[in-house]
Curated annotation (Swiss-Prot):
The chain crosses the membrane at residues 14-34, 46-66, 90-110, 134-154, 167-187, 218-238, 258-278, 303-323, 377-397, 411-431, 446-466. Keywords: Cell membrane, Membrane, Transmembrane, Transmembrane helix, Transport. Pfam families: AA_permease_2. This is Uncharacterized transporter MT2031. Gene3D superfamilies: Amino acid/polyamine transporter I. It is found in: Cell membrane. One of its GO terms (molecular function) is transmembrane transporter activity. Probable amino-acid or metabolite transport protein. It comes from Mycobacterium tuberculosis (strain CDC 1551 / Oshkosh). The lineage of its organism: Bacteria, Bacillati, Actinomycetota, Actinomycetes, Mycobacteriales.
């Protein structure tokens, strides 16, 4: 679609089909390669249902984010939504925790990449399973951060290359797995789906991991859905480019369900093929790329792992570029010190990059590089946004402010879906076993506890102090709206 003209040139905005493709590419990442083993172990033969539930929830929250973008035109960030609805007091916390969450997400991705790389490059060594602070795995992690910094020095061109590389890698790996897997299933009449029962064990349901209520399929499905949701992360960013889209009010609410449905269909096909090839092998595998464990042919298995590795590398490059910019955006708006936004001669915000990289390394170290716990943390950390943004949308829909007067209200997307998102988000959040974050081998994990307190309490508190100190210095009063 051609938009308005600027200096004689037509501005081409993203049409409906482009928005759908953007959504699909934003969601499909490393998650589908990494999560099947844990999901099968938690849900057994009901593992596909966990991905269906995760997809439905992702679709609901994505539509909530897209609807909020109708009221806030500046950008699609959760920081902007909550600031517009509740003022800086709430917006600052959401903005800071969003930056922290992005840093954690990058750390999880980097941990997965390093583990996979060590397994592929050194299959005879146990380096990929190391839990110690000082290990080959930690050194490789630091080296990988250095490589990502070097790539960042090349600027946007390198990021475009990384996105293209990631897309090619994941498309090739998934296509090869599905086509090759179906060929094996049909020609050799393979059906190992029922072996999922041997991998399944009912998980106790406990509120916050403390008060145990019962043990059964429901509790297992709740935890499996949280893990499966990691494969859908990225859906919350679909609406970020709303200003670049043609008629986002009309196209986003239609495009997002199609994108989620398409991704869900791909995931279900991939998971079904994997479970038919060998559910028990996937669940029992110690490899990072769980899907490959179902394949008996070594060459075919290597192709899938390398494709996933290429995909993870590209995603890490993009994360290393985007996550530090969240800190610089907060610094530019006065929430954080301006030195966080200072860039070197290569246009890299070194202070923000250092903060992001430190958090990216700290959390995997605190959780001993445990893939299941890292996946859960990456999802749970996002629930701050998943709960507050729907509340912000309800407030924006009720607002009588002039800037929101022209927005056409819709009771279903403005009230019903946000309420559903809030209820489900709270339900999943309280279902998570937080002991895996705060405890290690039965005792307190002081490293992890200190990190959580510093990142989610101390850092936001410092941001508030800095912001209000700046306000007092200029002699203005902060908005409480």
């Amino acid at each position: 679609m051609v938009g308005p003209r600027t200096r004689g040139y037509a501005i081409h905005k993203l049409g409906f089909c482009s928005v759908v493709m953007l959504g699909i590419n934003s969601i499909i990442g490393a998650g589908i390669f990494l999560t099947p083993g844990e999901v099968i172990g938690l849900a057994g033969p009901f593992a596909p249902m966990a991905y269906v539930l995760a997809g439905i929830f992702a679709g609901v929250v994505a539509i909530v984010f897209a609807t909020a973008a109708r009221y806030v035109r500046t950008n699609g960030a959760s920081y902007a939504y909550t600031t517009a609805a509740f003022g800086r007091r709430i917006g600052i916390y959401v903005g800071v925790t969003h930056a922290i969450t992005a840093s954690i997400a990058w750390g999880v991705l980097a941990s997965f990449f390093v583990s996979t790389l060590l397994r592929v490059a050194f299959p005879d060594k146990a380096w990929a399973d190391a839990e110690q602070l000082f290990s080959v795995k930690t050194l490789t992690f630091l080296g990988f951060i250095g490589v990502l910094l070097a790539i960042n020095l090349f600027g946007n061109r390198a990021i475009k290359w990384a996105n293209g590389t990631s897309t090619v890698g994941k498309a090739f790996a998934l296509s090869a797995f599905i086509v090759g897997g179906l060929w094996i299933i049909t020609t050799q009449h393979v059906n190992n789906y029922a072996t999922a029962w041997s991998a399944y064990s009912a998980t106790p349901y406990s509120l916050l991991g403390v008060a145990e209520i019962g043990k059964g399929t429901f509790s297992s499905m709740a935890l499996a859905t949280i893990v499966a949701l990691y494969a859908f992360t990225g859906f919350e960013s679909i609406a970020n480019a709303a200003e670049e889209m043609d008629a986002p009010d009309r196209n986003l609410p239609r495009a997002i369900p199609i994108a989620i449905f398409s991704v869900g269909a791909i995931y279900l096909l991939t998971l079904t093929v994997a479970m038919l090839l060998g559910s028990n092998k996937i669940a029992a595998s110690d490899d990072t790329v769980k899907l490959a464990a179902a394949i008996g042919n070594a060459t075919f298995r290597t192709i899938i792992v390398v494709g996933a590795l290429i995909s993870m590398f590209g995603i890490n490059v993009a994360a290393s570029f985007g996550a530090p910019r969240l800190w610089t955006a907060l610094a530019d708006s006065g929430v954080l010190p301006t030195r966080l936004s200072r860039k070197n001669q290569y246009d890299v915000p070194m202070v923000s990059f250092a903060i992001t990289a430190s958090l990216a390394l700290a959390f995997p170290l605190a959780l001993r590089f445990d893939n299941l716990h890292l996946t859960g943390l990456a999802v749970i950390a996002r629930f701050v946004q998943f709960i507050i943004v729907p509340i912000a949308l309800i407030a924006l829909a009720r607002s009588q402010a002039v800037e929101h007067a022209a927005v056409r209200r819709n009771a279903f997307t403005d009230k019903v879906l946000p309420l559903v998102a809030i209820v489900v988000s709270v339900g999943l959040a309280v279902s998570y076993d937080y002991r895996c974050i705060f405890l290690v081998r039965g005792g307190p994990n002081y490293f992890s506890i200190a990190l959580i307190v510093i990142t989610f309490i101390v850092v936001p508190a410092m941001a508030y102090l800095h912001y209000y100190r700046i306000i007092r210095r200029v002699g203005d009063r902060p908005s409480t709206r």
